[in-house]
Amino acid sequence: MTTAPRPDPRAFRERLLAREPLLGTFMKTPSAHNTEIIGGLGFDFVVLDEEHAPWDRGTLDMGLLAARAFGTAGIVRIARPDPTSILSVLDDGAIGIMAPHVDSAQKARDIVSWSHYQGGSRGLGIGRGGEYGARGADHVPFADKTTTVIAMIEDRKAIEAIDEIAAVPGVDCLFLGRGDLGLSLRNAKGAAPTLTEAVKIVSAAARKHDKPLAAVVPAMASDEAKWLIGLGVTAMMVLSDQGFMRQAAAAALSEFKSAYGRGEI
């Protein structure tokens, strides 16, 4: 049996902008092994979660190598949206970055600048991200064309500025960060939209400025996933590597108890 060739992970941005349905997950465990498993299954992208998990420069390097080896787009949710953090993961071969708590147009412009050479301020490095010099002078335009910038919308302030954020050139996708966004709205002083209303506001801004939407759900068969697809989400993330492990382990435990309880084994 032959297997269809995997898409070039460097085509991720093109596929995202074309609104191709894309499946991804968060990688919480700082190891290349889980990334290899997810990539081998055929996921379109993985997001190595530096913000909420103990990834460091060395483990990120190996995780991004594993993603590329299996034809999966490796993206990093950076812990700190600053030029050094963005430069290091792009040099190590990240296809793009996911920037947390983008709550103003200026922050969005800064992140776009730090992620691009031409018209930006990204420093030139010829490592894995630069294919070790194989493209020569073509590296700069190719990198600018293929680097993906995803802005996470996670704050009430971001909802208030969403039209300006979505209008920033170079912001390729808006991520509906509903966990932190819900906390921010509940903690807000004065009148604030509900989480459902806020999600619809972001969706409307994405349509207005022709930006793809991304989100994470616990399962694709859920009503939540269907609702988000209806709002225009095309880059859908399901759980995380640890979430999948917990699900599988819980199912095995349940099956074990059921089997012995019925005397089948």
Could you say what each language-model-derived stretch is?
Residues 1-265:
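Expand to "…catalyze enediolate/carbanion chemistry for C-C bond making/breaking, isomerization
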